[in-house]
A protein has these predicted regions:
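Aromatic-Pro/Gly-enriched surface loop or interdomain linker
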Residues: 1-75, 118-122, 230, 243-247
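An acidic, glycine-rich "communication" segment
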Residues: 1-2, 9-18, 33, 111-200
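Short, flexible/disordered intra-domain loops and linkers
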Residues: 15-28, 81-94, 123-129, 231-234
Length: 253
């Protein structure tokens, strides 16, 4: 079994409800990775889902911890969660820099995937802050210095540029629409397998690369709503896309 660690894709929201003179508050916990979890169930990929609030203290602080995994997925989680665990934020203690650790782990053969979202790449208002980090060094793309969201409310159907690539196997025909991406720049030595149509900006959607002995990838849209339409999540190619991509990332060398 290929061991995959998915980090992020959860959040907490609070709301105030007004009913005439009266009001009350509510708090809701949300999960964003359920389509991917369902798609990998019963497959050759053993997925562990580390929620965003757990990652501050539970994401490994040493190489032995990372070596338990073949592929790490960062999805909709900002760099501050890794840089400001409670030991640093509350007690001003020093801890290993997990962004540097992750880069080194990829360099010696680990597989790394960053998926898009409001707190991926540079993110909403630039708050994800992955630009100019060691993790960006390992990715096949570079982040913009600004709010990098590209909202496409009209929908965009991906243009597949490398239908012959193993990651694209079994994914023929038109893909269902996506509703947005993070704007990135593909590195010169990277492979852009799919992009947004040129008329909608031509932004990279799926990019592959290598860092040292490891393989890396960037998927610049969501892994579920809201940037992935319900049709995309229900598409028979949805699970195949992720299985193909994770299989490629897990292959060493």
């Amino acid at each position: 079994m290929t061991k995959v660690l998915l980090v992020g894709e959860s959040w907490v929201s609070s709301a105030t409800h007004y009913k005439g003179f009266d009001q009350f508050g509510s708090v809701t916990f949300h999960l964003g990775a359920e389509p991917l979890v369902a798609a990998l169930k019963g497959s050759d990929f053993d997925l562990t889902y580390m929620k965003a609030h757990e990652a501050a203290e539970s994401f490994p602080f040493d190489m032995d911890g990372l070596d338990a995994w073949d592929v790490v997925i960062l999805s909709d989680i900002g760099s501050n969660t890794f840089l400001l665990p409670p030991a640093v934020w509350l007690r001003s203690e020093t801890v290993p820099n997990r962004l540097r650790l992750l880069k080194a782990w990829v360099g010696k053969g680990g597989g790394l995937l960053m998926c898009g979202g409001y707190f991926s790449f540079q993110g909403i208002d630039g708050r994800a802050r992955w630009r100019r980090t060691p993790v960006e060094d390992a990715l096949p793309v570079t982040c913009q210095p600004w709010d990098d969201r590209v909202e496409m409310c009209e929908g965009a159907v991906a243009e597949v540029l490398r239908a012959d690539h193993p990651v694209m196997a079994g994914l023929g025909g038109a893909w269902p629409p996506i509703l947005g991406v993070n704007e990135v720049e593909a590195r010169e030595d990277a492979e852009v397998l799919a992009r947004v149509p040129e008329a909608q900006g031509g932004h990279p959607l799926l990019v592959l690369g290598r860092h040292g002995q490891g393989r890396t990838a960037a998927w610049t849209s969501d892994i579920g709503p809201h940037w992935l339409s319900p049709a995309f999540c229900a598409w028979e190619g949805y699970g195949r896309l992720w299985r193909n991509l994770l299989g490629w990332l897990a292959a060493r060398g």
